[in-house]
A protein has these predicted regions:
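Short helix-to-loop capping/linker segments positioned immediately adjacent to catalytic or ligand/cofactor-binding
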Residues: 84-85, 93-94, 155-161, 177-184
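N-terminal helix-turn-helix
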Residues: 1-76
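Amphipathic alpha-helical regulatory segments at dimerization interfaces
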Residues: 27, 38, 77-88, 139, ...
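Extended hydrophobic
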Residues: 164-219
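Hydrophobic/basic alpha-helical segments enriched in Actinobacteria
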Residues: 15-21, 26, 92, 110-115, ...
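Amphipathic alpha-helical effector-binding/dimerization core
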Residues: 54-152
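Short loop/turn microsegments at loop-to-beta-strand junctions
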Residues: 52, 93, 124, 170-171, ...
Length: 219
């Protein structure tokens, strides 16, 4: 029950912020009765709302992410580093991890400026379009990377997004050799990202520190 309830929550995203009972049932391969049961339970708990036809998530869902951020060791350990880096470069900095097809941002220190990139904790970006995502992909063992490439479609978000898997392989090899990643215009035109790895004692990347700026704002 808990697993399926979480799957229901994850079925809602930026492309489908609202779903009907039938649409959810089809998406998760549920009966309409089961879909309704999960939806009504989540509504009763305050995690979902409905207009009688469509359903959508409420802000209460953010508490789940806040609970993770409050309890997870990695964000708490790295936040002082992000603060120092932001103070030094005058730009917002972020902490990201790799989850399935996405780079997930789990920590941020904002620069004291009016205009800044809108990457908040909980933001997910396709890993192949993100400096942090590419950096983390480059540190995957070869077999794991090949499995990732096999199962993950490389969608185009701008005219410059790399969607060819052989091209991405070459880019990732370059990133691994140089130890950092720079992207520009891969997910959003004018957005430039620079990422470096957080390595554990075995040399594996457990996260990435990212600075992202709008190119037109750089002096």
């Amino acid at each position: 029950g808990l697993r399926k309830g979480l799957e229901v929550i994850c079925a809602f995203d930026d492309t489908t912020p609202k779903l009907t009972q039938s649409e959810l049932a089809q998406r998760l391969d549920l009966s309409r009765a089961a879909a309704r049961r999960y939806l009504m339970t989540l509504c009763a708990l305050g995690y979902m709302a409905s207009d009688g036809k469509a359903f959508w998530l409420t802000p209460k869902v953010m508490r789940l992410g806040h609970s993770y951020l409050a309890s997870a060791r990695l964000p708490r350990t790295v936040m002082p580093v992000l603060q120092t880096l932001t103070n030094t470069i005058g730009e917002s900095t972020n902490l990201a991890v790799l989850e399935d097809a996405d780079a997930v941002y789990i920590g941020r220190v904002s620069a004291p400026k009016l205009l800044s990139t809108l990457i908040e904790p909980g933001t997910r970006l396709p890993a192949h379009t993100s400096a942090a995502g590419r950096l983390l992909l480059s540190y995957l063992p070869t077999d794991d990377l090949e499995r990732w490439l096999t199962r993950t479609p490389l969608g185009a978000y701008t005219p410059f997004t790399v969607t060819d898997k052989d091209t991405l392989r070459r880019e990732l090899t370059k990133v691994r050799k140089q130890g950092f990643c720079v992207t520009e215009g891969q997910y959003e035109l004018g957005l430039r990202g620079v990422a470096v790895p957080l390595l554990d004692s075995t040399g594996s990347a457990v996260g990435a520190i990212l600075g992202a700026v709008l190119v037109g704002l750089i002096d």
